[in-house]
């Protein structure tokens, strides 16, 4: 997850339960980044990660590495960025590098640059994604970059998804939407409830949110909830850019009112698999237990 949907408590609880909690550091003030990392450290002694969107926030790299996270999570590098140099700086600090890719070409680039883990992200996911389905991109990448470990991302929310990713050759999964719908996630209650109530069909790939923020993501669309606000601005992105300040002010009022249908909510199709808001640690343990039971059952049927 990126900035705004994570905090130190969420990352700490995920790691403490046996996952890898990741703090989103992009577009976050330096002092807040340090605070989130320290909050996670107060909860757990287990490894944590910090995520940077390289196209926009490479300048934060030194600050993040000074805090000595066990894992540097990266994504969305520009073509002109030196991934090998960035990854080498992380390795020199003692961190492992986990890089997310939406295409096979980017997977090869990350592997050549020295990534320790590659996250193959499918278009099913929430937030900024590529255009290849999760099933295909995960299998493509696991075959192409072996023996580099691969995680699947986009559309995963339960133990069955984890078992499926393992069957595709991945070593695990990265979850975004599932952890937004947790007690610790620092988003409004209406946002979490919208995920729980979603059937997975009410999302859309769009550039509306980027037109509003003014950020140009390299080769990405954003999957968001198809709210009335999004419907209103689909196809009107140039006007939205011109009226950015005015519309931002209205959205801030929406947050205060808790009006989900006049907001932007980044979540993926896995929302259709989520039916409750739970503690993050409970989510981690439940997914692991479900996957173990599924794989145990499959082994027994094969005997």
Question: Model segments located where?
Answer:
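Active-site entrance/lid segments in N-terminal catalytic domains of soluble metabolic enzymes
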Residues: 1-149
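Conserved acidic functional residues
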Residues: 100, 154-155
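Conserved active-site-proximal phosphate/metal-binding subdomains
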Residues: 131-151, 157-303
